[in-house]
């Protein structure tokens, strides 16, 4: 029996094949039952046009299903990280999924598709140089992401890319209590700028921050109405059993 693929967030596509036609007007399409509830909340928030920046917090380190139950029960590879799920399912048809954390630096996320990975890497190389020079420093990395998003805005519409950004360990990018330092304040202001930029909400851009504990993230991000904070809960008994059988 073939696995059921989750509808991807696809603002430029057909609602029947993805989650709507535009960030502002598309109706939300129901995700399959096997998809996490937090994913449906993220999709609904994006498609409503109220936000393009999201903060996933809580149980963001557990493996999550990235295939239908029939497949996941027999294949451990049908489970992946939250970042895997975002790259393969939520943004599986987007042109670029760019991830960053302070440990691994900037990198494209393309799931298991090598052709998609090469295409992403080539496009990113044209924008920010050879992969060997991509910044690991958080200030430089956030500045590079900002430059990518700004360049995408001024590109002709037919050349614009659908870009998703996944910022893991967000508590180290915008930590609570550290906005007094110049570098931390700069990163915070850039992220807030993405959330409140009406132009970004009109093109195909989504930024997802992952944090283990919401209290460790700067309150300016947590409390901003333009940022959708979504809790990722601990798995229930049925989910734990499903994983144990994989």
Could you tell me what each predicted segment is?
Residues 1-246:
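ATP/nucleotide-binding catalytic cores
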């Amino acid at each position: 029996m073939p696995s059921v693929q989750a509808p991807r967030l696809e603002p430029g596509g057909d609602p029947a094949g993805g989650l709507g036609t535009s960030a502002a007007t598309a109706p939300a399409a129901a995700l399959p039952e096997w998809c996490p509830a937090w994913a449906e909340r993220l999709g609904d928030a994006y498609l409503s046009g109220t936000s393009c920046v999201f903060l996933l917090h809580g149980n963001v380190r557990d493996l999550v299903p990235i295939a239908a139950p029939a497949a996941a029960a027999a294949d451990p590879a049908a489970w992946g990280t939250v970042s895997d799920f975002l790259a393969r399912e939520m943004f599986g048809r987007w042109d670029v999924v760019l991830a960053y954390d302070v440990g691994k630096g900037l990198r494209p996320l393309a799931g298991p598709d090598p052709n998609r990975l090469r295409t992403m890497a080539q496009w990113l190389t044209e924008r920010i140089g050879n992969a060997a020079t991509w910044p690991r420093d958080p200030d430089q990395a956030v500045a590079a992401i900002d430059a990518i998003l700004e360049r995408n805005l001024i590109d002709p519409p037919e050349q614009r890319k659908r870009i998703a950004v996944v910022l893991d360990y967000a508590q180290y990018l915008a930590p609570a209590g550290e906005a007094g330092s110049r570098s931390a304040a700069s990163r915070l202001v850039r992220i807030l700028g993405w959330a409140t930029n009406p132009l970004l909400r009109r093109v195909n851009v989504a930024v997802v921050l992952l944090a283990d504990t919401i209290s460790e993230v700067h309150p300016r991000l947590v409390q901003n109405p333009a940022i959708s904070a979504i809790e990722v809960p601990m798995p229930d008994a049925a989910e734990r059993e499903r994983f144990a059988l994989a």
